[in-house]
C-alpha cells in the first residue's frame, strides 16, 4: 500500500490532537507531561492507529540518541521513506542546560513533523541506535502491552 505524505500527516495531526485533548491522568500510555518524555509511548499508540487504518503497512520505529553518553533520546516512526514524529516539540519545552547546542539551535520544533527522511532534521540531530518493525497484530510485542495499546487507543478515540 502506497500512502501519500498528506494522508500520513493528516492522520498524525488528528491523532496528536486526540492525545493533547485527552484526560492524561486516566488514559493508558499517555503521561501527564506530554509531549515531554512521551516519544516512544506516543509513537507506539500512533503505530497502533496506523495499523488499524492500514493493516498491510510495515512501520519502522526508530530509537535514536544524541549528547554526552547518548543521554538525550528520541523515538519516531517511519513509513517507507516518510518520517513521522508527533513529540518533537518537547525539545522546545526542556531546559537548555539539559540539551545539546544542536537541539537548541534547531528550535522551534513543530509538534508534528512528517517529511521524507532525506529532508528530515532528525538525522542531523540524532544517531540511530536501533529500529523496530511493526506490522498488524504486533507479533514482536508482548500481549499485555498490546492490550494496553488497544485500551489507550480506544480511550483516545471513543472518550
Walk through the language-model features, giving the residues of each.
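A structural boundary/capping signal
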Residues: 1-159
Amino acid at each position: 500500500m502506497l500512502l501519500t505524505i498528506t494522508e500520513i500527516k493528516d492522520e498524525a495531526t488528528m491523532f496528536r490532537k486526540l492525545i493533547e485533548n485527552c484526560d492524561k491522568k486516566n488514559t493508558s500510555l499517555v503521561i501527564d507531561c506530554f509531549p515531554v518524555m512521551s516519544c516512544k509511548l506516543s509513537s507506539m499508540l500512533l503505530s497502533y492507529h496506523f495499523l488499524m487504518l492500514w493493516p498491510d503497512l510495515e512501520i519502522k520505529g526508530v530509537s535514536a540518541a544524541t549528547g554526552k553518553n547518548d543521554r538525550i533520546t528520541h523515538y519516531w516512526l517511519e513509513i517507507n521513506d516518510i518520517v513521522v514524529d508527533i513529540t518533537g516539540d518537547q525539545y522546545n519545552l526542556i531546559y537548555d542546560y539539559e540539551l545539546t547546542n544542536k537541539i537548541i539551535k534547531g528550535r522551534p520544533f513543530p509538534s508534528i513533523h512528517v517529511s521524507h527522511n532525506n529532508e528530515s532534521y532528525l538525522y542531523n540531530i540524532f544517531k540511530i541506535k536501533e529500529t523496530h518493525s511493526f506490522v498488524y497484530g504486533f507479533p514482536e510485542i508482548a500481549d499485555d502491552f498490546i492490550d494496553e495499546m488497544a485500551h489507550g487507543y480506544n480511550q483516545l478515540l471513543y472518550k
